[in-house]
């Protein structure tokens, strides 16, 4: 028995458009100088100044595009946490949710993230000529989920990547423009630790073989933890406020800070020897300010082997940062 198969290829008008300059442009929001003692409160929604003008971006679709309309997609890597008044709030940072609206000249107000929004027509689309991506009146809203204390650096990050296509099926592979945010947030609420001095734990000389004998994650025999009392003094923070202290570090292995000798590291812990995991928002030491907005927090620290290997002999050190937050 013979089997016959007739396969028909679809004629596709799908095209992926690009920025007419060949490079995706960026619409950036600087979060510096946005927060103050009034709006730096949990649940507070802060509306950034509206970017009322057109974003000034033009796209171009390749030869072979047979339609004069386009679709626009606003793609994000952040996860929507809640929706308020149609605004889709995503967690952009430990302290902030963020949401946005914008207006298209034809489709009116949009609340990204959203994919394949049918936009208006322009005769240049099918002529391989530049046409305007008519986004304007961008409104960026921030919701404070954890009030800031002191200065917090928010690295520049892309909130939305915007794509233009000629069908709702085209792959989203060529960005036309991006919307980003970042900045240095400084607020009046301030806490000084250890009178501004570095907290140093010095363990002296330790035999290299003691680390390999201890094994990974363990403290060398005969080396005792050291204890420091960290004085905290806050300004523009309410007396008796409940706060937390946590640890930030650039090199981390499990619960340890990794030193400049990759085989060695340090554990920082509370007074009960419970480790504070670096860069973990939930690994904290809770404490309460007194009537003078001050407190003392006990820290303990000890060196450990990271790899279980015998380390290269010589000095080793690690640098971490203590951060105070509201509970």
Curated annotation (Swiss-Prot):
GO MF annotations in UniProt: D-mannose binding
Position of the signal peptide: 1-24
Gene Ontology annotations for the cellular component aspect, listed alphabetically: pilus
Keywords for the protein's UniProt record, in alphabetical order: Fimbrium, Lectin, Mannose-binding, Signal
GO process annotations (BP): cell adhesion; cell adhesion involved in single-species biofilm formation
Induction: Expression is negatively regulated by H-NS and subjected to cAMP receptor protein (CRP)-mediated catabolite repression.
Any Pfam family: Fimbrial
UniProt note: phenotype after gene disruption: Deletion of the operon under classical laboratory conditions does not result in any major effect on E.coli capacity to form biofilms compared with the wild-type strain.
Role summary: Part of the sfmACDHF fimbrial operon. Could contribute to adhesion to various surfaces in specific environmental niches. Increases adhesion to eukaryotic T24 bladder epithelial cells in the absence of fim genes.
The name this protein goes by in its record: Uncharacterized fimbrial-like protein SfmH
